[in-house]
């Protein structure tokens, strides 16, 4: 499904701390017809459950820097002072050509860059219900050391402090409900005046106005 030719495709930004459930909620968004996912580029190594090209393209530091210098990224940032992440511009071009809404799963640094370049992008922040629950989820994943969990919790606080920069907040205390909420946001955002102004103009013209 593509959007109406008179409807402007949207860019959705989804951010949230590690363990907030944002990746699962992004999958819920992609169940809404007319959406596509922006595959991020990163210098970090793939995890055991990850395959290249689905959620991330994995590249070397040299390759990432080459792409930065070439202006290939809509946004890019170094996370935890370690690995780099970036959103290739080609996904935005492809979404616009296909008439699809584009979903970006990016951190708060990247979100700020995108909002500066695309002020009408719809930004959604995923909140955990509490610090204790976030810590429980991080431990349950079994992927991180104690030091890494501590760093993630510290970063989570820093990220949550920036929630006011976002248009919508989803508290993920129940995945089913949070999934319905983020799908509702995806659909409702398409009814924004900024998205439908051209269509409204065309309708008005049909009256001879």
Q: PLM ranges: what are they?
A:
Residues 1-11:
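Extreme N-terminal, non-catalytic leader segments
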């Amino acid at each position: 499904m593509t959007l109406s030719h008179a409807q402007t495709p949207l860019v959705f930004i989804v951010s949230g701390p590690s363990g907030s459930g944002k990746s699962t909620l992004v999958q819920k968004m992609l169940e809404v017809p007319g959406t596509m996912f922006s595959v991020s580029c990163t210098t970090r190594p793939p995890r055991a459950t990850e395959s290249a090209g689905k959620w991330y393209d994995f590249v070397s530091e040299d390759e990432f820097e080459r792409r930065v210098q070439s202006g290939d990224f809509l946004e890019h940032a170094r996370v935890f002072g370690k690995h780099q992440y970036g959103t290739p511009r080609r996904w935005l071009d492809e979404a616009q050509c296909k008439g699809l809404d584009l979903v970006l799963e990016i951190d708060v640094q990247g979100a700020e860059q995108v909002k500066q370049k695309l002020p009408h992008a719809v930004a959604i922040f995923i909140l955990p219900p509490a610090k204790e629950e976030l810590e429980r989820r991080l431990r349950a994943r079994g992927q991180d050391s104690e030091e890494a969990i501590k760093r993630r919790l510290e970063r989570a606080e820093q990220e949550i402090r920036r929630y006011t920069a976002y248009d919508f907040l989803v508290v993920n205390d129940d995945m089913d409900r949070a999934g319905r909420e983020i799908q509702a946001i995806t659909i409702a955002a398409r009814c924004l005046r900024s998205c439908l102004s051209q269509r409204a103009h065309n309708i008005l013209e049909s009256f001879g106005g």
